[in-house]
Amino acid sequence: MKKIFKLIGKVFLGILAILAAVIIISGITHNILKPIEKNKYKIGQTVQVDGSNMQAYVTGAGDKTIVLLSGLGTASPIIDFMPLAERLSKDYKVVILEYFGYGFSDLTKNERSNKNIVNEIREALKALDVSGPYILMPHSISGIYSLYYALNYPNEVEAIIGIDTSAPNQTKRDKYEPMPSFLSLINSLGIMRDKSYLLPVTDNGMNINNYYTAEQMKINKVATAWNSANRTVLEEVNMVNANTEELYDVKYPEDLPVLALLARDTVDESQEWLTLHEELITNTKLQDIEILNGGHYLHWSNADKIVEITEKFISKNLR
């Protein structure tokens, strides 16, 4: 009997040793491949922001500048927004910024507060030599940063056109659950990379209208391996409650043109979604809400419609 227990113990230790070796190899492989892949697939231009590298993509020309700002945890905002940016660039200068922790940008230890993120946006635009005022086009959580930006630097924000953006008061009703920092090990040990390559690919609807090329979808996949659950993104997740609380009951400035494009799916899923955005409006002559059929990532399915609505909105309010 003792021999059997010893044998079982040895087998168990052997399995643990194999698992440890696999995890170590996975982590080493991931951290070797990550900079190689980033260099291979890099798109746009790199600017220095607070001593770190931030990636940006600038396209088009025109009297108006639209700045596209991504949702929380988007693997590569440049890839994510590319079809929309290409369409907008026919009439406008378009800038896509990849926050720290996203896409090809570095990680950062700076707190993911409204103040810091907005200052990084401003510094990046200055480094790109792109002058304002800007039309901010935020998706999801970037609606919070855009509101903060407009309130604190009104001369730099000409308008906001939101894509199913977060609203400050939503966390009064539904707090974000904190994410433990040790989850970043999932990223640094390459487990997200392993998952993306070993498990079947699930269709999240990103390419529902074939906006993206095969190469772009490939880059998005590797960017997911780089960035999912990294420490910077986790820090940003854990700042959502504080960042929204800072703007509780705040409304848009009365003289700021705003168009909130809401996703029909989100409105149907959350009874309060429309109300939360109506609460922000102070001037119905300049500020409006439009509901588009589709999911939270409206630019995956409605790029042409967003461009059409944007052109009408700018023509009416900003010319």
Where in this protein do the model-derived segments appear?
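Conserved serine/cysteine hydrolase catalytic core
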Residues: Y212-N283
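Alpha/beta-hydrolase fold catalytic core
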Residues: K2-I66, K90-Y92, S315-R319
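Conserved HGGG/HGGXW glycine-rich cap/lid loop of the alpha/beta-hydrolase fold
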Residues: S52-F104
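Active-site loop/oxyanion-hole signature of alpha/beta-hydrolase fold enzymes
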Residues: I96-M137
